C-alpha cells in the first residue's frame, strides 16, 4: 500500500558533475567533479510548482516532464510513497550538453531527494547507494556518469544482462553496478568548456558498429592501466588516457575539442574528451600552464579547475 507523505517535508540535494570515459574506459570509467547543482524539494498539499535558476533555465520544461521531477517521482515510487504536491527549486551550475553529465546529475539529485523524503517518513525506507546507481542508470541507459555522481571519486561501472540479472530487476532486465576508487591525492582535473554544445545522441551515432580486434585489445590494456594511473601512478596518465574506440571517430563533430586534446598532449598534459564532448578533460598533477589558459580564453573556452568530488549529499 502506497503511503502519502505529509506536507512540509523539505530536503536539499547537492549533486556533482561528472566526466565519463576518461579516455579508454568507454561507458565504464567515470569521475565526479566539483561543479554542483542543487535541488530543493518540499512536499505540499497539492499540485506541482517548479522553478529553475541558472544553467538551462530557459531551455528546460518547467513542469511534470522536467527530468528532476520525473526522477523525484521515481524515487518516491521506489520507496512506496507518494506526495500530493511538490515544490521544486533547481539551482543549476553544471553546463548543459557539454559532456559533464548534467542529465545524470539531474537524475541522481532528483532520485536522491525523492528517496530522502521517503526516509523522513520512515527511516527503514532509506535507499542504499547501489540502489541509486541502478535507478539512475535505468534513466541514463549506462552507469558511468550516474555512478560517479552517486559514489563520488572515480568509478568503474558495468552492466549485467544475464538470466540472474534479469531476475533481479525483471522490469528492466539489466543490472547496473559500480565500484568507487579513491583517486591519487595529487590528481588535479581541469576542464576546458567551449561555448558550443554537443548532442550525445549525435556523437554516439558516429561510432561504428564494430571495431578491429587490435583496437579493442589496445583499449582493454589502456583502461586497465587507467585504473592504476588514476589511483596510484599518475606518472602513467599519458599512456593510460589513450583511446582508439571513440575519440577519433567523433573528431569530425568536435574540431575544437580535438585540436585542444592534441595541443595539450603535445605539451605533455594527458587530455581526453569529457563524455561525448565538447568539453576537454585534462588530468595532471601540477599547475595548468598560464599560457595555455590564456590561449583557451582567446579561443572561447572556459578553463575550470573543479577538483574531485564526493557523491550526492542530501540534507
From Swiss-Prot:
GO terms for cellular component: cytoplasm. GO terms for biological process: threonine biosynthetic process. It catalyses: L-homoserine + ATP = O-phospho-L-homoserine + ADP + H(+). It holds the Pfam family GHMP_kinases_N. Keywords: Amino-acid biosynthesis, ATP-binding, Cytoplasm, Kinase, Nucleotide-binding, Threonine biosynthesis, Transferase. It is found in: Cytoplasm. Its main location: cytoplasm. GO terms for molecular function: ATP binding; homoserine kinase activity. The keyword Coiled coil does not apply. Pathway: Amino-acid biosynthesis; L-threonine biosynthesis; L-threonine from L-aspartate: step 4/5. InterPro entries: GHMP_kinase_C_dom, GHMP_kinase_C_sf, GHMP_kinase_N_dom, GHMP_knse_ATP-bd_CS, Homoserine_kinase, Ribosomal_Su5_D2-typ_SF, Ribsml_uS5_D2-typ_fold_subgr. PROSITE patterns: GHMP_KINASES_ATP (PS00627). ATP binds at residues 95-105. Its EC number is 2.7.1.39. Belongs to the GHMP kinase family. Homoserine kinase subfamily. Catalyzes the ATP-dependent phosphorylation of L-homoserine to L-homoserine phosphate. This is Homoserine kinase. The lineage of its organism: Bacteria, Bacillati, Actinomycetota, Actinomycetes, Mycobacteriales. The gene is thrB.
Amino acid at each position: 500500500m502506497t503511503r502519502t507523505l505529509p506536507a512540509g517535508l523539505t530536503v536539499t540535494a547537492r549533486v556533482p558533475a561528472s566526466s565519463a570515459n576518461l579516455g579508454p574506459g568507454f561507458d565504464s570509467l567515470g569521475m565526479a567533479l566539483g561543479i554542483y547543482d542543487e535541488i530543493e524539494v518540499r512536499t505540499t498539499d497539492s499540485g506541482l510548482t517548479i522553478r529553475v535558476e541558472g544553467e538551462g533555465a530557459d531551455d528546460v520544461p518547467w513542469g511534470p516532464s522536467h527530468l528532476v521531477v520525473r526522477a523525484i517521482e521515481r524515487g518516491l515510487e521506489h520507496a512506496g510513497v507518494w506526495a500530493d504536491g511538490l515544490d521544486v527549486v533547481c539551482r543549476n551550475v553544471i553546463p548543459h550538453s557539454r559532456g559533464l553529465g548534467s542529465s545524470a546529475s539531474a537524475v541522481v539529485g532528483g532520485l536522491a531527494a525523492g528517496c530522502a523524503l521517503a526516509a523522513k517518513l520512515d527511516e527503514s525506507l532509506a535507499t542504499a547507494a547501489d540502489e541509486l546507481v541502478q535507478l539512475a542508470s535505468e534513466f541514463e541507459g549506462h552507469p558511468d556518469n550516474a555512478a560517479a555522481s552517486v559514489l563520488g571519486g572515480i568509478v568503474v561501472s558495468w552492466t549485467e544482462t544475464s538470466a540472474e540479472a534479469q531476475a533481479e530487476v525483471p522490469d528492466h532486465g539489466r543490472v547496473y553496478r559500480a565500484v568507487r576508487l579513491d583517486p591519487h591525492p595529487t590528481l588535479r582535473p581541469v576542464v576546458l568548456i567551449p561555448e558550443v554544445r554537443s548532442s550525445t545522441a549525435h556523437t554516439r551515432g558516429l561510432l561504428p558498429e564494430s571495431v578491429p580486434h587490435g583496437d579493442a585489445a589496445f583499449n582493454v590494456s589502456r583502461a586497465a592501466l587507467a585504473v592504476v594511473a588514476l589511483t596510484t601512478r599518475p606518472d602513467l596518465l599519458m599512456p593510460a588516457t589513450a583511446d582508439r574506440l571513440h575519440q577519433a571517430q567523433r573528431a569530425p563533430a568536435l574540431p575544437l575539442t580535438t585540436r585542444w586534446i592534441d595541443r595539450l598532449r603535445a605539451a605533455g598534459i594527458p587530455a581526453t574528451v569529457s563524455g561525448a564532448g565538447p568539453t576537454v578533460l585534462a588530468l595532471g598533477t601540477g599547475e595548468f600552464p598560464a599560457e595555455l589558459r590564456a590561449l583557451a580564453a582567446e579561443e572561447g573556452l572556459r578553463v575550470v579547475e573543479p577538483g574531485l568530488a564526493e557523491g550526492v549529499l542530501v540534507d
